């Protein structure tokens, strides 16, 4: 059994899997800087099947440091969630949220304290208000599909409006008296002439 093992981008995916197979549980540290999806998948699964978690069980708590880049390219939802769960808050964790599902966005929300920045995020009414707020808090130029959003969801959007792309509120925005003056101002400031804005 290997102990005090540290993995880095110099090891390829096959080497990472082989080393993790003989490492002790919870004993391995990872510097994720420069790692590509195949290496990160090996960190999660070792030589096991995809989503097996055979590798991530060997990683120490907060054991992933360095620059960790997460996206759907080459990684499953289970793999992304597992990697985020073992990332140190001191790591630089960046997420490309392009085309992420509701479940994947929920995972980002659950691990938001470990994430430094999120790009290409799109949130909709399928996300809860708390999820919308946390995801947008780390986002850059996010897109919001505001159609049918509740007052609480729109409050979460308004509170993070600076992280929403200009004109990024989708096609339909409905405002009611449940929104404060400041929230209405923030939302209208990001709406464009392409938005169908209803005030009821």
Regions from the PLM with identified roles:
Residues 1-200:
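Solvent-exposed, low-complexity segments and loops of surface/extracellular structural proteins
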């Amino acid at each position: 059994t290997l102990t005090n093992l540290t993995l880095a981008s110099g090891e390829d995916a096959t080497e990472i899997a082989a080393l993790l197979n003989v490492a002790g549980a919870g004993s391995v540290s990872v510097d994720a800087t420069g790692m590509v999806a195949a290496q990160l998948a090996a960190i999660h699964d070792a030589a096991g099947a995809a989503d097996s978690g055979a590798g991530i069980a060997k990683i120490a708590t907060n054991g992933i440091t360095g620059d960790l880049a997460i996206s759907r390219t080459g990684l499953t939802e289970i793999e992304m969630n597992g990697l985020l769960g073992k990332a140190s808050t001191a790591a630089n964790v960046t997420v490309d949220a392009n085309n992420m599902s509701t479940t994947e966005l929920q995972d980002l929300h659950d691990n938001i304290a470990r994430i430094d920045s999120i790009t290409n995020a799109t949130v909709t009414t399928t996300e809860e208000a708390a999820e919308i707020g946390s995801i947008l808090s780390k986002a850059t130029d996010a897109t919001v599909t505001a159609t049918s959003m509740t007052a609480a969801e729109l409050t979460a959007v308004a509170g993070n409006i600076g992280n929403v792309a200009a004109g990024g509120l989708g096609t339909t925005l409905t405002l009611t008296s449940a929104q404060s003056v400041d929230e209405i101002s923030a939302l209208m400031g990001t709406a464009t002439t392409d938005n169908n804005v209803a005030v009821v």
